[in-house]
Amino acid sequence: MAEFKEQVLDILEEVCENDIVKENLDVQLFEEGILDSFAVVSLLVEFQERLEIEVSISDFDRDEWATPNMVIKKLEEIR
């Protein structure tokens, strides 16, 4: 589980180009401007390619994916 969490955080950090996602797992990704709609598409592609977890853009709800902790939780539910 810890390895999965680290993989998710690594992907988030790369796509967001901001290491705060590893330092503060409750940072508001959208409210703080760390993640935008373009980055969401890149993020979902990375999750599919690197973690083999497919998330449809239509299933993506900003409120459920608002923080790094929430992203990890949602991906754990899906996989």
From Swiss-Prot:
Leader sequence segment: none
Top-level taxon of origin: Bacteria
Disulfide bridge partners, by residue number: none
GO cellular component, one term: cytoplasm
Entry similarity comment: Belongs to the DltC family.
Domain Carrier: 2-79
UniProt PTM comment: 4'-phosphopantetheine is transferred from CoA to a specific serine of apo-DCP.
Function statement: Carrier protein involved in the D-alanylation of lipoteichoic acid (LTA). The loading of thioester-linked D-alanine onto DltC is catalyzed by D-alanine--D-alanyl carrier protein ligase DltA. The DltC-carried D-alanyl group is further transferred to cell membrane phosphatidylglycerol (PG) by forming an ester bond, probably catalyzed by DltD. D-alanylation of LTA plays an important role in modulating the properties of the cell wall in Gram-positive bacteria, influencing the net charge of the cell wall.
Main location: cytoplasm
The protein's name: D-alanyl carrier protein
Entry keyword annotation includes Cytoplasm: yes
Pathway membership: Cell wall biogenesis; lipoteichoic acid biosynthesis
One Gene Ontology MF term: D-alanyl carrier activity
Keywords: Cell wall biogenesis/degradation, Cytoplasm, Phosphopantetheine, Phosphoprotein
Residues annotated with O-(pantetheine 4'-phosphoryl)serine modification: S37
Alphabetized HAMAP family for the sequence: DltC
UniProt KW Transmembrane keyword: no
Gene Ontology biological process terms, A to Z: cell wall organization; lipoteichoic acid biosynthetic process
Locations listed in the record: Cytoplasm
